Amino acid sequence: MNLSTMEQYWVWLSSVEGIGPKRFYRLISEYGDARCVWDNADDDKMKEFLPAATRKKLRDARNEQYFYTLFARLEKCNMRAITRLSDDYPELLSRIYDPPATLYVLGACPLDNARSFAIVGSRRCTRDGQRAAREFAEVLAREDVAVISGMANGVDTAAHEGALIGYGRTIALLGCGADVI
């Protein structure tokens, strides 16, 4: 994984429990960059931005062992991190309100240059819902449209199955790291 030093600090900061996109970008705005957040984790001013429990988690994560373990786990899982600072961060994703600071990728991430369509739905969908998602995804895949969904049972699974039946590309997009599945 070839991340710049600044990207490594972005991955570190975005990995701290309790720091989602809103808090992440507020800290970056206040401190300038993720390395400065690391350097100022004990700053009293943090009280303005983070609740006590999150401040403690930030301080606990500010050590070389946590930092090393974070990247060792990614490497062990053959995953890579893509930050908003990375050249390969998806352009369209960067335009949404509060985009994820870091994406964790296993395999290819062809989101920028591929036509794609997201199919999402209930974990407890009906058989008709599963069938519709599977058939729709199969048709899209045959038209060279990448199918994007989560990894939950139900509609997500049916969408991926349909894309595979159609010999297409399927991309699982998670709201968490792949190690949390």
Where are these regions (language model features)?
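Glycine-biased, small-residue-rich flexible motifs in mid-sequence functional cores and linkers
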Residues: 1-6, 84-181
